[in-house]
UniProtKB/Swiss-Prot annotation:
InterPro entries, alphabetized: Formyl_transferase-like_C_sf, MPG, MPG_sf
Protein name per Swiss-Prot or TrEMBL: Putative 3-methyladenine DNA glycosylase
BP terms from Gene Ontology: base-excision repair
Disulphide bond pairs: none
Enzyme class per UniProt: hydrolase
Organism: Corynebacterium glutamicum (strain ATCC 13032 / DSM 20300 / JCM 1318 / BCRC 11384 / CCUG 27702 / LMG 3730 / NBRC 12168 / NCIMB 10025 / NRRL B-2784 / 534)
Gene: mag
One Pfam family this sequence matches: Pur_DNA_glyco
Keyword terms of this UniProt record: DNA damage, DNA repair, Hydrolase
The keyword Signal belongs to this UniProt entry's keyword annotation: no
Superkingdom of the source species: Bacteria
EC number: 3.2.2.-
Family recorded in the similarity comment: Belongs to the DNA glycosylase MPG family.
SUPFAM superfamilies, alphabetized: FMT C-terminal domain-like
Length: 189
């Protein structure tokens, strides 16, 4: 069943697990995501309102919000909710299921399969995300989101690497999947 991206991010996020996002010759099965809510979520890029940088997050659901993280990594979110609400789902980790040689060339030779798209920056690099992909629809022509084949077990916990709204259980992942990023002190199981 297709995902309704006009729903709130915390509803869409677990539905994305097991789906495949394809772009730039690479398909990645999504294994870990984080929901970022509207302007009430202090950890969201939209917390202080609309800016030129985060404008895509205020667009219609089902579009990409691509930004540069730590000055070098391109990270991607799928915008959710009605237009103007500023919600999205951060793509944290996944398994490369097609175009592995392309993903490997983007990430560097010798990166183990499970780590090719492990972490938001690596996910973006393996997928070939560019700032020019900001606002692009996940329904084509340059992106394609495929429904999941089966519904995986899903675990919910706190988001990683944020300092605000840390108690919110808005990180979702497939337990025991080797591609889940985790971080010291955060569960992967």
């Amino acid at each position: 069943m297709p995902i309704d991206f006009l729903q709130p991010a915390d509803i869409v996020a677990p539905q994305l697990l097991g789906c495949t996002l394809t772009h730039g010759g690479v398909g990645i099965r999504i294994t870990e995501v984080e929901a970022y809510l509207d302007s009430t979520d202090e950890a969201a890029h939209t917390y202080r309102g609309k800016t030129p940088r985060n404008a895509a997050m205020f667009g219609p659901g089902g579009h990409m919000y691509v930004y540069i993280s730590y000055g070098i990594h391109r990270a991607g979110n799928i915008v959710c909710g009605p237009e103007g609400t500023g919600q999205g789902v951060l793509l944290r980790a996944g398994e490369v299921v097609s175009g592995e040689s392309i993903a490997q060339s983007r990430r560097g030779e010798g990166i183990p399969h499970a780590r090719l798209a492990q972490g938001p920056g690596n996910f973006g690099q393996a997928l070939g995300l560019e700032i020019s992909d900001n606002h692009a629809s996940v329904f084509g022509p340059s992106f394609l989101i495929s429904d999941r084949v089966e519904t995986p077990e899903i675990v919910r916990g706190p988001r990683i690497g944020i300092s605000k709204n840390t108690e919110a259980l808005l990180r979702f992942w497939i337990p025991n999947d080797p591609t889940v990023s985790g971080r010291r002190g955060y569960p992967k199981e």
